[in-house]
């Protein structure tokens, strides 16, 4: 995270980060987030992209941005931005723009034109959105968003459940209600619009909500900080008031394909 102030995850000097990425050959995928990288001028953004592209093992550069939704003219009126993408998003090493469209009304003609300009410049696009109370916490609205995105070639990627922290608690949705909204939206969509996953960005990893029964709710680690949690499946008794993963106190069952030292061993 490079662009926000007063945050332990943020840095204004990216040289150490670039050095770490260069020296860590396991890294093939880098995400620029913040803040919003595309608020930067092209003259400030391009050197970062250039240095990342010069690292041989970095195959994908991702840019998390709301710009295509709220200011598509940043794309449409800056030929140098599109030229930068043409230069550094290559046939074998793509740049992905992780767009943040939260409501179908944001998909204006100008926004769609901007998205097409990015695609014409060789950029791959996906969309991710938080589920926001009063904005898209409605199956019809979410289904319309998924469908419209699929129609224009922007696959739905993640729907995030928001942790209820100071400042956003008003907009957060309980996990089980969010799952119900999400699944009702998906059944209103055709196949290509169904690809989103409902997740939480938890300190222990990215946790997907994968199902519910009358009594239980099920989670799976889509990505984990600890190796033994990779693909770990967990079942809890339902708690309709739970707003975050930590509100489920004790798993009634869990299963992992991996142990810390033996990734080919099944454990339970």
Features from the language model and the residues they span:
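Conserved AdoMet/S-adenosylmethionine-binding subsite of the radical SAM
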Residues: 14-23, 27-29, 38-189
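Acidic-enriched, low-complexity/disordered segments with a strong bias for Aspartate over Glutamate
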Residues: 8, 13, 36, 78, ...
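Auxiliary Fe-S-binding modules of radical SAM enzymes
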Residues: 147-268
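Short coil/turn segments at secondary-structure junctions
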Residues: 1-5, 36, 169
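Canonical Radical SAM [4Fe-4S] cluster-binding loop centered on the CxxxCxxC motif
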Residues: 1-11, 63
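Fold-independent oxyanion-binding glycine-rich loops
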Residues: 34-35, 66, 203
């Amino acid at each position: 995270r490079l662009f926000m102030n007063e945050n332990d995850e943020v840095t204004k000097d990216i040289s150490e980060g670039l050095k770490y990425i260069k020296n860590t050959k396991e890294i093939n995928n880098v995400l620029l987030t913040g803040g919003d990288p595309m608020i930067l001028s092209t003259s400030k953004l391009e050197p970062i992209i250039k240095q990342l592209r010069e690292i041989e093992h970095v195959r994908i550069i991702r840019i998390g941005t709301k710009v295509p939704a709220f200011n598509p003219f940043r794309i449409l009126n800056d030929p140098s931005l599109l030229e930068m993408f043409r230069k550094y998003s290559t046939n074998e090493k793509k740049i992905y723009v992780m767009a943040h469209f939260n409501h179908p009304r944001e998909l204006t003609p100008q926004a769609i034109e901007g998205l097409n300009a990015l695609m014409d410049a060789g950029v791959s696009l996906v969309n991710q959105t938080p589920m926001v109370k009063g904005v898209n916490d409605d199956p019809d609205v979410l289904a319309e968003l998924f469908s419209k995105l699929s129609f224009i070639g922007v696959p739905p990627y993640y729907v995030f459940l928001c942790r209820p922290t100071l400042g956003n608690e008003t907009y957060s949705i309980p996990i089980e209600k969010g799952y119900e909204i999400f699944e009702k939206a998906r059944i209103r969509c055709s196949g290509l619009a169904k690809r989103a996953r409902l997740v939480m960005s938890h300190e222990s990893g990215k946790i997907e909500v994968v199902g519910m029964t009358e009594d239980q709710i099920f989670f799976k680690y889509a990505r984990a900080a600890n190796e033994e949690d990779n693909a770990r499946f967990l079942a809890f008794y339902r708690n309709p008031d739970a707003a975050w993963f930590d509100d489920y106190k004790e798993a009634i069952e869990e299963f992992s394909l991996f142990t810390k030292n033996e990734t080919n061993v099944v454990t339970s």
